[in-house]
Amino acid sequence: MSATETKYVPRLYKKYKEEVVPKLIQKFQYKNPMQVPRLVKIVVNMGVGEAVQDIKQLERAVEDLRAITGQQPMITRARKSKAGFKLRKGMPIGCKVTLRNHTMWDFLDKVISVALPRVKDFKGLNPRSFDGRGNYAFGIAEQIVFPEIDYDKVDRIRGMDIIINTTAVSDQESLLATLTLGLPIRAM
């Protein structure tokens, strides 16, 4: 890399460094900058219950998730057998992707600026979805809100869960960080 080239920095990561970190240091009086909560990873999960009867449904879900995240999904398998669902231990029932570093920041930027505004009747994310340890989870009911998904080629609508994992020790720290980043969490 020559001296004139600049290193790629995700837009949301730059915002985190320039706006979120100083705001959190001021609000919570951190003595050490390493105490400031940061995003560790984002896990995107698609549960495909229909995969028990039709494995093609799972293959299509994997294709959708690969297009949305830009990363090869991992197949998730049943941990227990459930006779009511005709499910055996070890059967494939979903897929997930773990995003870190630049791909995590780019995906979160895409969710905030493109996907969530396209959700029908969107009134903001639930503020009670924090887990008590600073992590935040929410769901998106339709994969078609992402621009990578071609609406005409969708065989059925599938939802997904998105879990934002942080180093925050409390929900208040994580709430302030995610709000400053631009995540549209509605008021309590």
Curated annotation (Swiss-Prot):
GO terms for cellular component: ribonucleoprotein complex; ribosome. InterPro entries: Ribosomal_uL5, Ribosomal_uL5_bac-type, Ribosomal_uL5_C, Ribosomal_uL5_CS, Ribosomal_uL5_dom_sf, Ribosomal_uL5_N. One of its GO terms (biological process) is translation. It comes from the Bacteria. The keyword rRNA-binding applies. It holds the Pfam family Ribosomal_L5. GO terms for molecular function: rRNA binding; structural constituent of ribosome; tRNA binding. Gene3D superfamilies: 3.30.1440.10. Keywords: Ribonucleoprotein, Ribosomal protein, RNA-binding, rRNA-binding, tRNA-binding. Coiled coil: none annotated. Belongs to the universal ribosomal protein uL5 family. This is one of the proteins that bind and probably mediate the attachment of the 5S RNA into the large ribosomal subunit, where it forms part of the central protuberance. In the 70S ribosome it contacts protein S13 of the 30S subunit (bridge B1b), connecting the 2 subunits; this bridge is implicated in subunit movement. Contacts the P site tRNA; the 5S rRNA and some of its associated proteins might help stabilize positioning of ribosome-bound tRNAs. Part of the 50S ribosomal subunit; part of the 5S rRNA/L5/L18/L25 subcomplex. Contacts the 5S rRNA and the P site tRNA. Forms a bridge to the 30S subunit in the 70S ribosome. This is Large ribosomal subunit protein uL5. It comes from Aquifex pyrophilus. The lineage of its organism: Bacteria, Pseudomonadati, Aquificota, Aquificia, Aquificales.
